Swiss-Prot record:
The modification S-(dipyrrolylmethanemethyl)cysteine is found at C241. Monomer. It comes from Chlorobium phaeobacteroides (strain BS1). This is Porphobilinogen deaminase. Binds 1 dipyrromethane group covalently. One of its GO terms (cellular component) is cytoplasm.
């Protein structure tokens, strides 16, 4: 058994919440284990002047931490799973998937308006093409804009801006105690979340058996199966830049149900589909469900939509 673990994390308030949560959970199971946090500044934390859609988001918030993991400076990295590319660097692996927070997106509006009651041509802040596409498919009158930065910064910028509303993930808003700012929680029928949204992914070195055994106490099998299905779908579709794909999997009584959305950025072309995999007892079966649904989306024309978007990446 190791006597000390070093956790690598970004320094944003939400990332620190996630690292502190991981540290506390591990300490419950291993009270004699010394745990240290190492803060790492990532490319995504530095490049705040450009929208994510312009600079891409493949590993922007993970690569720099992974370098420390590969070199042995840290023993594990704690990520928001939605930020983790579907292909991990050689020698690294996701060793635990934590119990998932509510995966839905929320609307934060200046005067408590909902999606339906926001005024004509309302100005909406989001850095996500996925949210932009789904919103415009329902409300093509919306004027979309971008706010970057950590959650605290985004709230400050929003309050000082002329935006009417802002879209965020419930998980981060709840974890940092901004829940009283929520105007509406959007159901999956309206807005599908990002792949892995609401879950933490704990990354280790493949050959570090001691650390893998320690972090295994945090693995939630339901989260593992569901997010592996979502990530397999994304891996089968994605080309290397931020694209409007939403997905959500649920596992009940051994049956995995997977929903997916692909749309053009302007929301004029959209595809939604779903699949159920019965008796899903292995993670490989969950991943196969993701691949099968991705194939169905491609047959429905998702490849044409994604090809157009990739031209601008």
């Amino acid at each position: 058994m190791k006597k000390k673990l070093i956790i690598g994390t970004r320094s944003s308030p939400l990332a620190l919440w996630q690292a502190d949560f991981t540290q506390a959970e591990l300490s419950k199971h291993f009270p004699d284990l010394e745990i240290e946090l190492k803060l790492v500044k990532t490319t995504g934390d530095v490049l705040l002047d450009s929208p994510l859609s312009k600079i891409g988001d493949m590993g922007l918030f993970t690569k720099d931490i992974e370098k420390h993991l590969i070199s042995g400076e840290i023993d594990l990295a704690v990520h928001s799973l939605k930020d983790v590319p579907t292909e991990t660097p050689e020698g690294l692996m996701l060793s635990a998937f934590t119990e998932r927070e509510d995966t839905r997106d929320v609307i934060i509006s200046k005067n408590g308006e909902s999606l339906k009651t926001l005024k004509q041509d309302a100005k909406i802040a989001t850095s996500s093409l996925r949210r932009t596409s789904q919103l415009l498919s329902m409300r093509p009158d919306f004027q979309m804009g971008d706010i970057r930065g950590n959650l605290n910064t985004r709230f400050k910028k929003f309050d000082e801006s002329d935006f009417d509303a802002m879209m965020l993930a419930y998980a981060g808003v709840h974890r940092l105690n901004f829940g009283d700012r929520i105007s509406e929680i959007l159901p999956h029928e309206v807005m599908l979340p990002a792949v892995g949204q609401g879950a933490l992914g704990i990354e280790t070195r493949v050959d570090d058996e001691a650390t893998k055994e320690i972090v295994s106490v945090m693995n939630n099998v339901n989260t593992e199966f569901c997010t592996k299905a979502e990530r397999a779908l994304l891996r089968h579709l994605q080309g290397g830049c931020q694209i409007p794909i939403g997905s959500y999997a649920s596992l009940k009584n051994g049956n995995l149900h997977l929903l997916a959305y692909v749309g053009s950025v302007d929301g004029k072309r959209t595809i939604r589909n779903e699949i159920t995999k019965e008796n899903c007892t292995l993670p490989e079966q969950a991943e196969q469900a993701g691949i099968e649904l991705a194939e169905e989306l491609l047959k429905q024309g998702a490849n044409e939509i994604l090809a157009e978007i990739r031209k601008t990446c």
